[in-house]
C-alpha cells in the first residue's frame, strides 16, 4: 500500500510543479485544452483518493499521506482558479496570486487543556507550526486527546494552506535562523565547550524545515537557447581581456627594449638575468591584469539581466509573464535574484564589490603598490640601480651618535610608519577576507533557494498519531469498574495502609526518577534508536526544544528526592486519579506531575512490599494504531493514558479494566495474582 501511495504522490508532485510554473507564465501561451483535460483527471482522482486519505489520516497518519492530501486539495483549487479567471487577461496574475486580497497567512487556534484552560496559539509562518509542535509535545499530558486532535487538525489545515502547490515555499513564509528539533538533536551530539544552548543556537542555519539547494549555473543557458535559433549575442568579454594595465605595459616594453641589446653570444650579467626572470614570472599577472572600471559587479549583473530581457523579443514578441508585469526594484533583485542569473552570482558580485571598495582606499592602494616586489625591483633595474645591495661600511659605535642628523631621524620615523602601515594593511586584508567569507555564507544561506523539507510534516504527524492512538486505546472494549462503590473505597484504603508505613530504598529512587522522567517526555523526543539517550537527557532535550524556562527544570528535579516517603506522594482522595482541578497551564502541568509521580512510586513500593512484578506502560509506547485490537494483544500491566476520564487501564491475562483510583487497581491486581498463585 505504501508503494502505491508513493507512486501517486510522485505523479501528483510532478504535476503540481508544472502548475506552479504556469502561475507565472503568460496565459496567452498556455495550451488550455491540455489544462482542461488535466483538470478533469485531477477531479476524478480527487473523488477517488481524497476520502480514503481522509480516513487513513484519521486512523494513522503519515507525512506522505498528509502532504498528498494537501497537494491534491491545493491542486484542485488552483486549476479551478485558472478556469475562472482565464478570460480576464488584465487581472489574471492578480487573481491567480490573490495580490489584492488581504493576507490569509495568519491563524489563531485555541487549544482547550484540562479544566477548561484555554490557550490561544497564533501562527503566520512555517516555523510557528514547528515551534507549536515542540511546545505541545512538552505538555502532551495536560490535554485530552479529543481536544488536542481538534486543534491539531486546524494546524494541519493551516499547514496545507502554506504548502500551496509549489515545492518552493514563499520567502516570507519561513525563517532559516530558527532552529527546529532536529537542529537541536544535531547540536546535542557535539561538545558544547561550556556554552549554553541558546548561544549555540544563535548562528544556526536550519536545513530541515526548508531544505537549502546548492546554486546551479544559470548564466549562459539563455545564450545557448539563442544560439540554437541562430541569434548572435554580443559579448564584451574579448574587449575586457584585451585591456591591460598601462603601468605594467610601460614597464614591460621598457624591459624588453633593454633586453634587446643582449645577444646569445654575450655573457649574461646579473641584472640581465634578473630582468629576464622577472618578466617571465610576472607574465601570468600581466595576462590577468585589467583596468579598474567604475562599474561595480552588481551593476554589471543588473545590466546583464536587462540585456537578456531585450533578447527575449527575438523568441516571442509581445510576451507578458508575471515578472514582466511585476518587476522587482534593483534593491529587491538582490534578495530575489534574477531570471538570467542565480543567487550565487549575486553573492559573488557583492563580495567582489566589497573587496574592490576596500582596496580602492588611498592608503591601501599606496601601500600595496609599495609592497609589489616585482614593481619595485623592475623600477630599480630600469633606473640603472645595482640590484646587489652593498654592505654598509663598518662604523664604530662611538661615532654613530655624532653622524646622526635630523634627516636620518625623519627617515627612520617614516620607515617605522611604513612598517606599521604595512602591518595594518596585512591585518586588514586578512580581516577583510574573513569577513567576506563569513558574510558570504550568511548571504548564501539567506538568499539561496529552498524547497519544502519534511521536518514540519514529520513532527505534526507524530503528535497527531500519539493522540489518535490514545483515543483509540481508551475506546477499546474495556471493563469499567464502579466509580463510587464502598468496596472499592475499602480496597483502596487497604493498599494505602499497607504501603504507608514502608519506605523506598535510596538506591531505588534514582531508577524511579528516570522512569518518572520517561513518562513525561514528549512524543517528539522519544528515543527509538539503537543507542537511546538516558531518560533525563531525553527530557532535557524535550524541554529545551520547547523553550522551557530554567525554573521548570528545577521544579522537575524537586519532584523526587532521596528521602521521599509515602506521605509525600500518596493522595488522600479516592477515585480522583488524574482529576485536574487547577485552572492555569503551569499549575495543570505540575498537578499532572504529582499524579504520574504517585503512579511510579506507589507501584514500585507495592511490588517491593508484596514481591510483585507489576509493570507500568504509557500511551507513548504505541507504535501503530489500536483500531480493532483486543486486550489479549497487549502486555499485562498498568497503562497510563493521560486521559482524565480513563487514566489507568489495567491489562491482565487477556482482560482489561479501567480505573480512576490507583490503589483500587493495585488491590484488584493483588486479588488476581493471589488466585493464580493459589491455583
From Swiss-Prot:
Location(s) in or outside the cell: Host nucleus
Gene Ontology terms, MF aspect: ATP binding; zinc ion binding
Keyword set, alphabetical order: ATP-binding, Host nucleus, Late protein, Metal-binding, Nucleotide-binding, Viral genome packaging, Viral release from host cell, Zinc, Zinc-finger
UniProt signal peptide: none
One biological process term in Gene Ontology: viral DNA genome packaging
Zinc finger (C3H1-type): 180-208
Cellular component, GO annotation: host cell nucleus
Key word Zinc present: yes
Classification via InterPro entries: UL28/UL56
Lineage top rank: taxon: Viruses
UniProt entry tagged with the keyword Metal-binding: yes
Pfam families, sorted: PRTP
Function description: Component of the molecular motor that translocates viral genomic DNA in empty capsid during DNA packaging. Forms a tripartite terminase complex together with TRM2 and TRM3 in the host cytoplasm. Once the complex reaches the host nucleus, it interacts with the capsid portal vertex. This portal forms a ring in which genomic DNA is translocated into the capsid. TRM1 carries an endonuclease activity that plays an important role for the cleavage of concatemeric viral DNA into unit length genomes.
Assembly mode: Associates with TRM2 and TRM3 to form the tripartite terminase complex. Interacts with portal protein.
Recorded family membership: Belongs to the herpesviridae TRM1 protein family.
Name under which the protein is recorded: Tripartite terminase subunit 1
Protein source organism: Saimiriine herpesvirus 2 (strain 11)
Classification of source organism: Viruses, Duplodnaviria, Heunggongvirae, Peploviricota, Herviviricetes
Gene (UniProt): TRM1
